[in-house]
Amino acid sequence: PCGLPTDETIPIGRYGSSNVGRAKSVYRMGLGHRYGRRMQTISGIHYNWSLPGVDSEQYFALIRNFRRHAFVLLYLFGASPALCPCFVEGREHRLERMEGGSALYLPHATSLRMGRLGYQSEAQATLAVSYNGLEGYAASLHDALTRPWPAYEAVGIRNPGGDYNQLATTLLQIENEFYGTIRPKRVIYPGERPLHALRERGVEYIEVRLMDLNPFEPIGIGASTLRFLDVFLLHCLLSDSPPDTPAEIHELAHNQHLTAARGREPGLNLMRQGQSVPLMQWGAELLEQLGPIAALLDQAHGGNEHALAVALAQAHLQN
């Protein structure tokens, strides 16, 4: 975000006087206590995506592959390498001051929003959510929704005046507080919890959450990027997707933070199945695999716009 006032003067979202509206406001009050209100000024693109005939098992396979390859999206489309000093006031950081200005940045950063300065917390860092299936995923979230967290217990549900501080003192107040790069989703009924909807009726679509706003696009994202995402997500769905492991989950978090903070650093290596591999090499291999899918989409829709989107990504990777 741009210049901000002091944290306590940033207003909390208000959603009316209904029970649902009040719960939304209390949830955001809780986010303010947990992460600071400045965090709620962060914006990004959420891209919802589905295909007919795809079941929960297939969506989770897609999600596992997406998480493995998300570094490519951060590298290509990350657009938050710098920020206003007010955003990190009172927080530890290793940002540098931009020459001739007041902005702070990291020289090779791609997306500070998706790094350690974004929606991250000591509490959520303890979560190692597996995406091997709906039940395991749901069990992980249920644990976070019911596990008390000492720092949040200290805040309490209500303040001395009786007003709500937060919805709960557990690690997560509600499911939406878990900030992953991608989520399995289901349209919910009025009053229904997202986790209940997923367990009862399965995954209906996925929500991609790591895309930064493109400052050069009026609506924050361009048509070419959307076409690339469609090709990328189809590749994630169609490719072999072995189960994840605790070791791989740790690797993926490492890769995300490294790419967010240092993704454009020449010679940067990521971790893949316990081995160090150059980001550029891995990224080039992945983009090469997208070509046939782009060609099939263009064959179905006419033109060559999907192939051009992949070619543009390949050019950006090498630039």
Each model region followed by its residue ranges:
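Loop-rich catalytic cores of soluble enzymes, especially ATP-dependent carboxylate-amine ligases
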Residues: L4-P5, R22-H33, S50-L198, R209, ...
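Cationic, histidine-enriched alpha-helical/coil surfaces that engage anionic ligands
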Residues: I157, D163, H254-N319
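Structural preference for beta-rich elements and adjacent junctions enriched in aromatics
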Residues: S18, R22-V26, R38-T41
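Exposed beta-sheet edge/beta-hairpin loop segments within beta-rich domains
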Residues: R34-S43, R199
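Histidine-centered divalent-metal-coordination microenvironment in nucleic-acid enzymes
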Residues: M39-P52, Y205-D212
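Core structural elements
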Residues: E200-E204
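Signature for HUH/AEP ssDNA processing cores
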Residues: P1-A23
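C-terminal, active-site-flanking charged/polar segments
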Residues: L210-F216, A223-P243
